[in-house]
Amino acid sequence: IPAAKAIRRAGIAVIIANPRQTHQFAQSQPLTKTDAKDAKMPAFFAQMTAQKEDSQTMPYQPPTEAEEVLEALVNRRNQPADMRTAEKNRLHQVHETQVGSVKQLIAHFDRLIDELDKQIDNHTHTHFDGKDQVAEQIKGIGSITTATLMAMLPELGRLSHKRIAGLAGIAPHPREGGETKFKSRCFGGRSAVRKALYMATVAATRFEPLIRDFHQRPLSEGKPYKVAVTACMRKLLTISNARMRDYFAEN
């Protein structure tokens, strides 16, 4: 990422490609392997990507200073949040003499997370000119989920619903071979975005009528809970993407 930022700020177009794609592209080339050919391979891949009219890779745009600070705050908040979860799980396993110690640590993480939440709220309200309030209009999506989407998914509102779902790793990928059809699976994507969307979806299925009804539909058809939740996550992201797109159009 630092190299991509420097190159882009020098006025050169940059694409951050999926390593799987570049590896498969290299394997599709002639078998001769030399250092010179390896050095040229990224250039060949970039040329082919640039020639595609419907390129699936969005040109990289370096984040603004405000976006970098927001990403740092969100990343920092996730760290004590993960440690707090680990301590809460540990609370039921430790010896009774250590329960107080674990509770003290959980309380410490609570205070740290609360302070970071305040910093995130202040930063988004100060530097994002109402952008942070667009997604929050949906019941279930709070300030932290919104901050995570803005920090970890800056493409929100600028790509199609299908592509934005792919970046989040919640777009099902069909798997077929001959007459055999396997279940579609979701994989890859940005785990921090998925985690935030999952927590928001759990709340939205209770308080947002549209998502609640959308959640009940696959369950009534006998589909697994995980399938229903993933579909709701995708629906929630689609709504957020559409509203953010409208925000950009108006501003």
Spans of features found by a protein language model:
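Helix-hairpin-helix/helix-loop-helix acidic hairpins
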Residues: K88-I144, L153, T205-E208
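Acidic, carboxylate-rich catalytic segments that either coordinate divalent cations
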Residues: R206-N251
